[in-house]
UniProtKB/Swiss-Prot annotation:
Interacts with RAD51D and XRCC3; involved in homologous recombination repair. Interacts with SWSAP1; they form a functional complex involved in homologous recombination repair and stabilize each other. Expressed in ovary and testis. One of its GO terms (biological process) is double-strand break repair via homologous recombination. It is linked to Ovarian dysgenesis 10: An autosomal recessive form of ovarian dysgenesis, a disorder characterized by lack of spontaneous pubertal development, primary amenorrhea, uterine hypoplasia, and hypergonadotropic hypogonadism as a result of streak gonads. The gene is ZSWIM7. It holds the Pfam family SWIM. It comes from Homo sapiens (Human). It comes from the Eukaryota. This is Zinc finger SWIM domain-containing protein 7.
Length: 140
């Protein structure tokens, strides 16, 4: 089952993708909308995209995860398919307090999809499992 972002965010990302496809840039009005919806997280997410900090890791079985190198040089795992990030801000602000719908890492993943700037890495199913298990060990 796919997790759906609130309609306004889905629509904004869709319009941004169309604009990028048409003109290879994001118009200022969409950037202002991002800032309005996400506050400082929008700027931080765009910075992560600009620094090419997002890597899409895919395996032969079709599983896909994103890794985002955060501003603190720590790598976080994001699952766009179920709207999840392993960072503490996601656990606290999104899941626990419901202050936000996305952390900056997950927003960066969605923006990098729109802008088509994800680094790509293909790994075996075992390697992907090892990556996810290593992430789990680091959390513990």
């Amino acid at each position: 089952m796919a997790v759906v972002l609130p309609a306004v965010v889905e629509e904004l990302l869709s319009e941004m993708a169309a604009a990028v496809q048409e003109s290879a840039r994001i118009p200022d009005e969409y950037l202002l909308s991002l800032k309005f919806l996400f506050g400082s997280s929008a700027t931080q997410a765009l910075d992560l995209v600009d620094r090419q900090s997002i890597t899409l890791i895919s395996s032969p079985s079709g599983r896909r995860v994103y890794q985002v190198l955060g501003s603190s040089s720590k790598t976080y795992t994001c699952l766009a398919s179920c709207h999840y990030c392993s960072c503490p801000a996601f656990a606290f602000s999104v899941l626990r307090k419901s202050d936000s719908i996305l952390c900056k890492h997950l927003l960066a993943v969605y923006l990098s999809q729109v802008m088509r700037t994800c680094q790509q890495l293909s790994v075996s199913d075992k390697q992907l499992t090892d990556i996810l298990l290593m992430e789990k060990k680091q959390e513990a």
